[in-house]
């Protein structure tokens, strides 16, 4: 995890910290692991995400 050192304004430091947290996906990972997810639910979520990526790629190429 990156260390943020900003001298001066607290708001700037907080904004930079939030940006780093969002970029590394720490908050989303925490929310996802907050409760137990059954393997079948996890598999369906991953399949849904893969399908979404495929459709997005096809739309980008103009095939859909």
Swiss-Prot record:
Presence of the UniProt keyword Endoplasmic reticulum in the record: no
Of the GO CC terms on this record, one is: ribonucleoprotein complex
Q: Which GO terms describe its molecular function?
A: structural constituent of ribosome
GO BP terms: namely: translation
Keyword list, A-Z = Ribonucleoprotein, Ribosomal protein
Name the HAMAP family for this protein: Ribosomal_bS21 (MF_00358)
Question: Per its record, how is this protein called by name?
Answer: Small ribosomal subunit protein bS21
Q: What is the lineage of its organism?
A: Bacteria, Pseudomonadati, Aquificota, Aquificia, Aquificales
């Amino acid at each position: 995890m990156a260390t943020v050192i900003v001298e001066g304004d607290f708001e700037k430091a907080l904004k930079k910290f939030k940006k780093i947290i969002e970029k590394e996906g720490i908050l989303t990972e925490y929310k996802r692991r907050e409760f137990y997810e059954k393997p079948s639910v996890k598999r369906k979520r991953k399949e849904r995400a893969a399908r979404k990526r495929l459709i997005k790629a096809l739309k980008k190429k103009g095939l859909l």
